[in-house]
């Protein structure tokens, strides 16, 4: 299963978010997921960033709690928001319906 973090912040907070991100990205992540990203795009409202986490089976809850704690450190940034979304592969989604390819 994948988790995707979608972050948003105003352009004026980019330096603050960037410094925090550098500190966090330098830390050794848990061994139960692989991170891809971050990727960023710029909108009229500011910056939108995406990080994708490929989570080991059975560790989804642990990964979600860990990421929630990580992203909570950004709450001091004015205008910052994050949504952590659960993404299923087509095989995982079909399995929920009792189907398979």
Explain the meaning of each model-derived region.
Residues 72-88:
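Conserved short beta-strand edge segments in small beta-sheet-based binding/regulatory domains
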Residues 1-66, 86-101:
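Short S/T/G/P-rich N-terminal loop/turn motif that feeds into the first structured element of a domain
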